[in-house]
Amino acid sequence: FAMEVYKDIRLVGTPPNSIGKFGGDTDNWMWPRHTGDFSMFRIYAGKDNRPAEYSTKNVPYRADEYLRISLDGYDEGDFAMIMGFPGSTQRYMTSYEIDRMLTITNPQRIFIRGERQKILAEDMLASDKVRIQYASKYAQSSNYWKNAMGMSRGIERLDVKRKKQEQERAFQQWAEANSVDGERYDEALGMIRDAIAASNEAYAAQQYLNEALQRSVEIMTPASYVIAAVGKKGKKLEDPEALKERLRGFYKDYNPATDRRVARRMFELVMEHVKELPDVFVAAEGQFDDLDAAV
C-alpha cells in the first residue's frame, strides 16, 4: 500500500469545559454518557491537495472517500462503530480473568481508594490550601475508582462471564476435534484456569499492597523519583537539577498531616487483609509500640 504523510494538522474546535466535563465525577465511567469530551482536528494540504509543510496558504484537505454524518438519528439495527485506537484492551479476557476482576481487582480498588478519598475529602473541606494541593490527586484516584464500579456493573448487567463461558465451551469443542500432536489447543483453557487459580492469592496480596501503599501513601514517592533518576545501583546521578525540580513539584502539593492520616489507615487495612506481610511490617512491629508511633 502507499502512504502519504500530511504534517499540517490543526486544532480547529473544542467544546467548552461545561460540555467537556458535563456530569463531572458522578457520570464518570457510567453509560450512557452525555459528555462532549472531544476535540476536532483538520488536515491541511497544499492547493493541489498534496502534502505540504505548514503555510498560511494551505487549504483543508479534500478526501476522495469519506463518511457522511447523518443528522437524521438512528434506528435499531443500524451499523455502529467506535472511532479511535485503544492503547490496550481487555476484550479477550477469559471467564477466569473476568471472575478475578469481579471478586478481587475491582472490589479491592473500590474499597481501598474509597477509604483514602474519604480522608482526602475531609482535609480538603477543612483547608483551602489542601483543597488546591489535592484536587488533582483526588480526581486521579477517583477516576479508576469510578471505573471499577462502572466496569463491574456493566459486566454483571451484560452477563459477560456467562457469555465468555459459552465462547470457551465452543472453543473447547473445536479444539478437541482439531488439535494435533504438538498443538494441544484443547489443553489451553485448562492451563489458563489452573494458572489463574494458583496465583489468585498472591495476586490479591500484590494488588492490595500496590493500591494501599504504592498508590496511596505519598511519602514513598520521592524515593521512587530518586530510584528512577539513578537507575542501576551505584550509577551516578546524571541530572541532579532535574531531580530537584521534580522533588520541588512534589513537595509543593504535599501535606504531611494528610498523608500521615492516609498512611495510618492504609497500614491498618494491609495488616487486616494481607496474610503474608512484607518484612518491613515485621520489623516495624518489633521497633514501635503501636501503629501511631510507626507512622
Predicted regions and their residues:
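Terminal presequence/propeptide segments associated with secretion/organelle targeting
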Residues: 1-295
